[in-house]
Amino acid sequence: MKSFLVAFLIVLVFFCVEMKIGNGFKIHEVPEPTGKWCGYSVPMKPCINDDRVKRCIAENTHGWLMATGMCTSIPSLKDCYCMHQCP
């Protein structure tokens, strides 16, 4: 019973601190994309000669190309640079 009371008090203190900070257990918003879609079942060609872009398109028919050079379809990892179709 003592350990339950201690755990409850710790959670209560943590909650009060969160409320004082102002975020109060809010769910973080997904960041806005910083780049464009790598393609969506449409063949897209990079306008820049970048092997990472070509690999991203070859391995994935859709996804976001991140600044690290990896392609992802996870919306919360939209840290990418602009990819667009060549004329």
From Swiss-Prot:
<keyword id="KW-0929">Antimicrobial</keyword>
<feature type="disulfide bond">
    <location>
        <begin position="56"/>
        <end position="82"/>
    </location>
</feature>
<protein>
    <recommendedName>
        <fullName>Putative defensin-like protein 317</fullName>
    </recommendedName>
</protein>
<feature type="signal peptide">
    <location>
        <begin position="1"/>
        <end position="24"/>
    </location>
</feature>
<keyword id="KW-0611">Plant defense</keyword>
<keyword id="KW-0964">Secreted</keyword>
<feature type="disulfide bond">
    <location>
        <begin position="47"/>
        <end position="80"/>
    </location>
</feature>
<dbReference type="GO" id="GO:0050832">
    <property type="term" value="P:defense response to fungus"/>
</dbReference>
<dbReference type="GO" id="GO:0031640">
    <property type="term" value="P:killing of cells of another organism"/>
</dbReference>
<dbReference type="GO" id="GO:0005576">
    <property type="term" value="C:extracellular region"/>
</dbReference>
<feature type="disulfide bond">
    <location>
        <begin position="38"/>
        <end position="71"/>
    </location>
</feature>
<keyword id="KW-0295">Fungicide</keyword>
<keyword id="KW-1015">Disulfide bond</keyword>
<keyword id="KW-0732">Signal</keyword>
<comment type="similarity">
    <text>Belongs to the DEFL family.</text>
</comment>
